[in-house]
């Protein structure tokens, strides 16, 4: 079995593959203070709950935007899976030509998403990932990573309002039924969520003007479905895009 890790600033998402089939996926909190043994015990419990054995994992791939966690998980997989993981980074085969000024600056998660989106949907394609940050990536019809945009995510926006104002409360990110709201909490929710929808649609329209009017737009990440319900530019949501990208990259490097 192949175990894939997508390590983000807020969550770690894991997928277990048998061949090309995703058997299970899990989401746990990203905690820098956890040791490799603590992660090993937690992941082992998730496996056992789903009738699986961690020792049956014979391959691992890790994509991480949090370097300390990457090293912790690397130690964990060596000890508990008896296998050295493939790390998404410089030198691995992705099949994508990165046109960034400095290709090493591109986050591993963005590369993984680009690989999956091009493999599944073809190009040109735009990938929007709604995570801690909201990122946009442009991939050409020739499988070139042209660049993109990094914007504050919804949770960051909500936290900023709470932390930088004297009277505004901490809120849950749920979508109000109307844009015009009659209380503070729903007014904040409206501004953050519908404001994000407006940002997404404007940025996508500008991206299409600059590189491909016919680009297909795929969204992923925790808030993707909520934003896609209101967006006029998102064509589809793929919750497992990053996990699929990790599987594809592993297969390209397995030989």
Curated annotation (Swiss-Prot):
GO CC term, one of those recorded: cytoplasm
Record bears the keyword Zinc: no
UniProt key word ATP-binding: yes
Residues given in the record as substrate binding sites: 100, 107-110, 184
Subcellular location: Cytoplasm
EC identifiers of the protein: 2.7.1.33
Catalytic residue list: 109
Positions bound to ATP: 6-13, 132
Catalysed conversion reaction: (R)-pantothenate + ATP = (R)-4'-phosphopantothenate + ADP + H(+)
Entry protein name: Type III pantothenate kinase
Species of origin: Thermoanaerobacter pseudethanolicus (strain ATCC 33223 / 39E)
